[in-house]
Amino acid sequence: SSVEPRSLSAYVWSFAAKPKGKNLVHHNVFFNQDYSDEFKKISSGRISEDPTLYVCAQEQSIKNNKNQRYEIIINAPPVSLNKISDKEEYDLCKEITFQKLKKMGLTFHPEPTTKNLTTPANFETLCPGADGSLYGLNPQKMMSTFQRPTTKTKIKGLYLTGGGVHPGPGLPMAALSGKHAAEMIKKDLALT
């Protein structure tokens, strides 16, 4: 039996800094010029030179002179498709991310370092066997949504929840998956 291809992974910068330039809201997306090209690059094992960047300004509503927490997410290939070394990966990711933000009018001080970057390989270490994938099986196939594991398993007392389980990826769907699991457990244990 063949192994089904995995969905996207990501490079995630998590850091505290002072922003300069563009005013941010809590959720910010900096789109690229060619969205389909970004995914062609990812499917060939590389990140785009012009990736879409998601920037979460976690403490945007708190006005102070201290460093504030940020998270920047860049789509990436799963580990099995990744074609570059760890050192190359870090250097490339840093250059691409912060040069693009600078062009868009946003800089951070201090700029993050290696310790602030979580890579697809780090996600694979955290969740062995997932290939660094964040969303389970590759959702590009027509029936992939219906092939996700369901909440209840064949093993008594084992229930699944999360973005790789029905109904699918993303925080709202993962939360809904958790709700489904809780309802199934209550039903199976005859709790009210």
Residue ranges and their predicted role:
Residues A16-K18, N64-K100:
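Conserved FAD/dinucleotide-binding core of flavoprotein oxidoreductases
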Residues K20-G21, D86-T125:
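Flavin-binding catalytic cores
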Residues Y54, T107-P167:
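A glycine-rich dinucleotide-binding beta-alpha-beta segment and adjacent secondary-structure elements
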Residues S61-N67, P149-K154:
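Short glycine/proline-enriched loop/turn "hinge" motifs that connect secondary-structure elements
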Residues G163-K186:
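A conserved FAD-binding loop/helix module that cradles the flavin
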